Amino acid sequence: MSRSAIQVAKTATYLPDLVEVQRASFKWFLEKGLIEELENFSPITDYTGKLELHFIGSEYRLKRPRHDVEEAKRRDATFASQMYVTCRLVNKETGEIKEQEVFIGELPLMTERGTFIINGAERVIVNQIVRSPGVYFKDEQDKNGRRTYNASVIPNRGAWLKFETDKNDLLHVRVDKTRKINAHVLMRAMGLSDNDVIDKLRHPEYYKKSIQAADDEGISSEDQALLELYKKLRPGEPPSVSGGQQLLQSRFFDAKRYDLGRVGRYKINKKLRLTIPDSVRTLTHEDVLSTIDYLINLELDVGGATLDDIDHLGNRRVRSVGELLQNQVRVGLNRLERIIKERMTVGETDSLTPAQLVNPKPLVAAIKEFFGSSQLSQFMDQTNPLAELTHKRRISALGPGGLTRERAGFAVRDIHPSHYGRLCPIETPEGPNAGLINSLATHARVNSYGFIETPFWKVEEGRVIKVGDPIYLSADLEDECRVAPGDVATDKDGMILADLIPVRYRQDFEKVPPAQVDYVQLSPVQVISVATSLIPFVEHDDANRALMGSNMQRQAVPLLRPERPLVGTGLETQVARDSGMVPISQVNGTVTYVDANSIVVTDDEGGEHLHELQKYQRSNQDTCLNQRPIVRNGDKVIIGQVLADGSACEGGEIALGQNVLIAYMPWEGYNYEDAILVSERLVKDDLYTSVHIEKYEIEARQTKLGPEEITREIPNIAEESLGNLDEMGIIRVGAFVESGDILVGKVTPKGESDQPPEEKLLRAIFGEKARDVRDNSLRVPSTEKGRVVDVRIYTREQGDELPPGANMVVRVYVAQRRKIQVGDKMAGRHGNKGIISRILPREDMPYLPDGTPVDIVLNPLGVPSRMNVGQVFELLMGWAAANLDCRVKVVPFDEMYGAEKSYETVQLYLKEAAKQPGKEWVFNPDDPGKLLLRDGRTGEAFDQPVAVGYSHFLKLVHLVDDKIHARSTGPYSLVTQQPLGGKAQQGGQRLGEMEVWALEAYGAAYTLQELLTVKSDDMQGRNEALNAIVKGKPIPRPGTPESFKVLMRELQSLGLDIGVYTDEGKEVDLMQDVNPRRSTPSRPTYESLGSDYQED
């Protein structure tokens, strides 16, 4: 196939760097955030006020990390740098100053790809979207249906302040959801006189009722107000004026306890039209008075006061890595402060040094906790490059300080008009997290306040000005403008052609003449996320199916020989490049050396730049990471040129699947209910073969009875089972292993109690110690097989960090090639997913007029009800492209080039393809897009023409090999004695309540009985049944299930006299099969208790 790619539509501009969100945020943390925290934190004074410790934040430094990224991954270490900061200890009495550089902890560093390496695993810190600090006005209806208004002042950290109106026109205030207090009591406590307040209000007559109410309660002075405030906030403690003063001061006016943040100050100033400087981060009297004034205006419906919509993106902000890390550092420093104060008090004042005061542990622990166990620090999804990229651009409303799944209602999850161009309306999970986890739209970026912005071109006098950089607007700024969509038609000078243009203005749609338009969107793709923008013709798909398509592209397994799509959208190159999977040239120059492992580019000055390639490494999801060079020796390269393909990339473009020939027709019921019928060609030609690498690990520990040993000398194992082990007992690289094979031989010392009776007898007779060890080797689990590709041995002598108690750790990596097979899940890019039901020989597949057999047969009934017609456009456009020997790029939302443009373009290409010599049959004008196929088994034509074409189909990570599972005998749960569940535990299938009903409905009494007893938790019964089966005897009657005995015991332990009786009233002893020698009944009865006493 030739490499010419035809561009059907041009996007306006290149996309921004797609991982910028992560990198910019971490850069801000290193340059500003960390310094800010260290400086806010000092000085620390001891309780007597003699000593002061200052942290000089601007002079902090980071040492070079101990390991580089690759080394850290290999050693299971963290890629981190040591932080040092200059501390100054000032003795106020003597004036002595001691200055010293102090180690304050390790800080994990971000790699170039926007990830962190924590304990050898790549992790991503997901961005969190939370309610922005500021002031919010809401209305509520009371019990009588009357509207009341309230205002909440929400800080970044500190106490919430909420003002409310009631039906008597009184104003109340709550601090942190405590009891209501008359608002004027708070004013008086803050030291404001009645006139101070009244002068600030535009409608003071409403407020005078609250003043009157305060006077009626007998609270007329500041001192009385402070006492009242203390009583309400600290009920049960003896109130005092000084206590009230201190409480108020620390709650709202102390910068250490109360912080609006830069954003909160900006939002309050904007909403209340104040001009308080950015540096004032606490509440001021002006804030409180303006809030009351605004609330009264709302109540009286004057002065243009408006309510706030908390789901509007102007009121929600993104907290990225930098800020989340900054908050965590603050937690650590607060813990550190307590320790320092204690040490200052305890230690000898003269001999103290900063290094003795500062203990790095609390800070280290706080940072470690954040990276290791925070909800927002996630194991990176490395299934393929797209999954990796999307994970870094994810925005979650969950996590600390955010929402919980249960609490989140429909309003939070819903698409909001302000999401346009900021959050993708399509890409979100299905299920309980729908709408809480979103993806950043393609062109969106996060500004310094944490609000999401999206770019526009300015429009002046009806002319779009595409000069220089586009203008970025946040959601609340955009509301004030009239914004036209990105697909408006313009002439070559940029003049808008139509007479009336649909625009968005204040979250509504109107039509205005071009002269009134303020801005035009940059590109039609900017509304959707990266994954969605890779779906061609997405505008013809129902949103639910586009959602599935976006999510399933992230689950595509990288194939052995990837192939880029015939029909793409033009974003494939950028996705591959920004995912970090493909090495890129940093300079202009010439390739001077290429092999499978490395590429050297020599720049024009003669400097050499080495690019190491990843070879067959295991990803977090057990898929295979591998890079293949695509440049040759002597090639000239420029900055930004792709030098090698990563996994699921071809020619520098992302290639998640294969282009295969697809026919939409039923075939003998094998594609009923979304099943897929495939040709043997996909198996034989390795079209959908992927490499998976499993990691197996074993550690030799120190036990009470002595150390475990990794060895070849394993008791009771035949020599042929040890054939592939080396002299240490570790499998050799290159060996082929199957389930049950030994990978690493290990023996554990065993105590006296572990010895079977025959061994005890032998020892008694011969007095010789049989080797007191038991086999505890690492074996290949059931259903797994493959080739050993790598073995790594970690010991303390080599300087590796091992888990406590371990002397040696051995890791074995086993790779397997998985061909496609029945039961594997496949999908297109339009949410058309299915399971392979049968693999047919090539000669039995339906074939085209030129004799080509099709690769996949899909059910046509999968299209109409699901309304994902984009797959049909892709199919036919792919058919045309394959016959024209080219590749096509189609940008989504192509109506700007005219109505029905997709339809016209596809038709045009098909006609073009049919003009090729010998290809007249490719397009039949009477039945456009369909061909007459013949049955491969009989050679007869099918009665109806069939839609045939090339589509990009993916193999998903849900492989049948990982899911298929069977159990004959296996482990049981300790308490209930029922089989464990799940493949990993070698478990059984759960027979739940509804399955029992099904068996009851058919009267299958014996089947049901043995499922509930012999096959589950009747301990004696199952042993007897197994014996009977082995010996070929009839299976005996089942006994009592263990779970019934547990239930009886629980009821008896509640003091209930419960027993099981036969029809004749004779008590049945449930416990008799447990201990046959026991004479007492299964529970104490009066008779048995009496007999016990007589024996005594």
Curated annotation (Swiss-Prot):
Region Disordered, as annotated, extends over 1069-1096
GO MF? DNA binding; DNA-directed RNA polymerase activity; ribonucleoside binding
HAMAP family this protein is in? Answer: RNApol_bact_RpoB
Does the record carry Transferase as a key word?
A: yes
Which domain of life does the UniProt lineage start with? Bacteria
* Keywords assigned by UniProt, alphabetized: DNA-directed RNA polymerase, Nucleotidyltransferase, Transcription, Transferase
Recorded hits in NCBIfam families, A to Z, give: PRK00405.1, rpoB
Enzyme class, UniProt record, top EC level: transferase
From the Swiss-Prot or TrEMBL record, give the protein name: DNA-directed RNA polymerase subunit beta
Q: Which InterPro entries match?
A: DNA-dir_RNA_pol_bsu_ext_1_sf, DNA-dir_RNA_pol_bsu_external_1, DNA-dir_RNA_pol_su2, DNA-dir_RNAP_su2_dom, DNA-dir_RNAP_su2_hyb_sf, RNA_pol_bsu_bac, RNA_pol_bsu_CS, RNA_pol_bsu_protrusion
Species whose genome carries this gene: Prochlorococcus marinus (strain SARG / CCMP1375 / SS120)
